[in-house]
Regions:
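Catalytic loop of the DD-peptidase/beta-lactamase superfamily, centered on the K-T-G motif
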Residues: 1-172
């Protein structure tokens, strides 16, 4: 957060890895209160957190609700080998599904630098938690499986807002 008051020749820069909270904004506002009032005039953190919760809270709650209850009779996943492989997307590049510690792992980015464990939900539907800033927000990863019982595509929900989150299996 960068807050400047040129008329008073003062400003503050707050660097924080605190999203989605209002901590950086609260620090800046409290700083200006201290400079101009000599004391904090209100609980800025509570006010900013309420604002951030109103912006991001509904999305987190909706995602949690979508995945909080397993189907009454969930179908088991196929063998990991049905899903493991390289997948390509013209917009996002490559996604690699591999096996790690007995579970499936999604790797994205150059050289697979971002890894996300996939938890099973139902048959070919899995859950990941791709947002470091919002670790409690689940997101779906759904495989499209052909008659050969092998995935030919995977849709990554958090990349699919504009319908561009489906990756096709790359030829080996």
């Amino acid at each position: 957060v960068v807050s400047l008051l040129p008329s008073h020749q003062i400003g503050i820069v707050v660097l924080a890895n605190a999203f989605p909270t209002g901590a950086p904004e609260a620090i800046a506002d409290t700083f200006f209160d201290l400079v101009f009032q000599g004391k904090p005039t209100r609980d800025w953190l509570t006010d900013w957190n309420k604002l951030y919760d109103s912006l991001f809270g509904p999305a987190i709650k909706a995602a949690k609700k979508r995945y909080e209850t397993l189907p009454v009779t969930p179908s088991p996943a196929l063998a990991h080998s049905a899903y493991i492989g390289n997948y390509a997307n013209d917009y996002f590049g490559e996604a690699v599904i591999g096996e790690e510690n007995g579970g499936l792992m999604l790797k994205l980015g150059p050289h697979g630098q971002k890894s996300f464990a996939l938890g099973h939900f139902d048959r070919d539907n899995f859950i990941s938690h791709p947002f470091d800033e919002m670790p409690n927000m689940p997101s779906g990863v759904t495989f499209q499986v052909g008659p050969d019982q092998k995935a030919h595509a995977v849709t990554i929900e958090n990349l699919n807002d504009l319908g561009m989150g489906t990756f096709s299996r790359a030829s080996n």
